[in-house]
C-alpha cells in the first residue's frame, strides 16, 4: 500500500492519499484502526470479507504511512546515498493539511522540515545537516522569492521553483497560488471513488 500512497501523490492526487490516511470511514487506514487492526488487511473490508480470502497480517499500518509521511508530506527525499544531498519536496497541494513537523537523523546530522500554510501563504523552516546540500522546491513561480544570498535559484519545475541550498537553518515565507490543488486531474472523480467504486 505504501506504493499506492506515493503513486497517488506523484499523480497529483495527494488529497486522495490523505483521505485514505486520515478518514475513519470505509475504505481507509483509519477504518482498519477503528476496527482494531494493527497490521494492514489484505482487503479494505477485512472485517467482513470471507476469512479464507483475506489475510489480516500484512505490513504494520504505520509502516506504510510513515514512508509516505516522510517522503511526500515532510518532503525528505535522498538525491544521493545517505542524504549527502537532500531533496525537500513536500506536497503542499493537500488543502485539508495545514501543517507538518518532521525530523530525521542522517549520517550527517538531523534534517528538519516544519511547515504551515494557508491557502495563500507558506511558512517553512528547514535544517540541512553539515556537509550536505539540498534542492528545495517552493510552491511559487517567483524567481526572486528567496532573498538569502546563500540560496541560489536553479530552475522552474511545474508550479514550483527549485533552489540550491547549503547546510544550515533556513526560513522560507512565500505566497502561494490559492488554486494549488483545486484543479486535480487523473484517476477517478472523488464522488465515484467514495460512492460507487466496488472496493473489496
Predicted regions and their residues:
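Non-catalytic C-terminal accessory modules of carbohydrate-active enzymes
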Residues: 15-200
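Alpha-helical support elements that line or immediately flank enzyme active sites
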Residues: 1-11, 134-140
Amino acid at each position: 500500500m505504501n506504493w499506492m500512497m506515493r503513486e497517488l501523490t506523484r499523480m497529483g492526487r495527494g488529497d486522495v492519499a490523505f483521505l485514505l490516511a486520515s478518514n475513519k470511514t470505509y475504505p481507509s487506514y483509519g477504518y482498519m484502526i477503528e476496527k482494531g487492526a494493527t497490521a494492514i488487511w489484505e482487503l479494505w473490508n477485512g472485517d467482513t470479507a470471507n476469512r479464507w480470502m483475506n489475510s489480516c497480517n500484512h505490513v504494520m499500518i504505520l509502516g506504510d504511512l510513515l514512508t509516505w509521511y516522510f517522503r511526500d508530506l515532510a518532503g525528505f527525499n535522498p538525491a544521493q546515498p545517505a542524504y549527502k544531498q537532500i531533496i525537500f519536496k513536500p506536497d503542499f497541494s493537500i488543502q485539508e493539511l495545514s501543517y507538518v513537523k518532521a525530523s530525521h537523523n542522517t549520517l550527517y546530522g538531523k534534517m528538519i522540515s516544519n511547515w504551515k500554510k494557508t491557502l495563500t501563504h507558506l511558512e517553512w523552516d528547514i535544517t540541512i545537516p553539515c556537509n550536505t546540500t539540498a534542492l528545495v522546491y517552493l510552491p511559487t513561480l517567483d524567481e526572486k522569492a528567496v532573498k538569502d544570498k546563500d540560496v541560489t535559484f536553479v530552475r522552474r519545475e511545474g508550479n514550483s521553483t527549485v533552489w540550491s541550498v547549503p547546510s544550515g537553518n533556513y526560513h522560507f515565507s512565500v505566497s502561494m497560488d490559492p488554486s494549488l490543488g483545486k484543479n486535480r486531474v487523473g484517476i477517478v472523480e472523488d464522488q465515484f471513488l467514495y460512492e460507487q467504486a466496488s472496493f473489496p
